[in-house]
Amino acid sequence: MEKLFEWVINHDEISVLCCPSFKVINTIKKLDIKVHNINYDINYRDMPNVICNDFVFDNVRLKECVLHYNCEKTYPVGKMHTGIFILRGDDKEHNGDCNPIRSIDKLVEDNNIKKVFESFTARIKNYNHYYVYGTNI
């Protein structure tokens, strides 16, 4: 997880998509980075500092750098937005995962990443988490 924050600190402002962990959001804020916390889950609609919109279907303006924390749950953001991406997806295959992630290559291909700055895989709780930092510009 530290690597994720190493990537985030390269940016002054970031759109964070589908991150259920307020610990992650608050850590990014403590790094003095402006966070646009966007989550489509209606359970977050009354929470302060959460933009409760679906970035796929609603008119949501994303920042140049986008951290998508649950790529397996949505349409690939890189097919709709041009910029710098920090992408995380896992192969746990939860009910409702419409975009299963089984490799770094899948994240790269789905999001039209032209240049990968860094990537890694972490095994946590008997399944893999895939991370990519790159751009489709």
Walk through the language-model features, giving the residues of each.
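Short, polar loop motifs at secondary-structure junctions
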Residues: 21-22, 38-46, 74, 90
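S-adenosyl-L-methionine
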Residues: 1-11, 37-67
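Conserved class I S-adenosyl-L-methionine
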Residues: 11-21
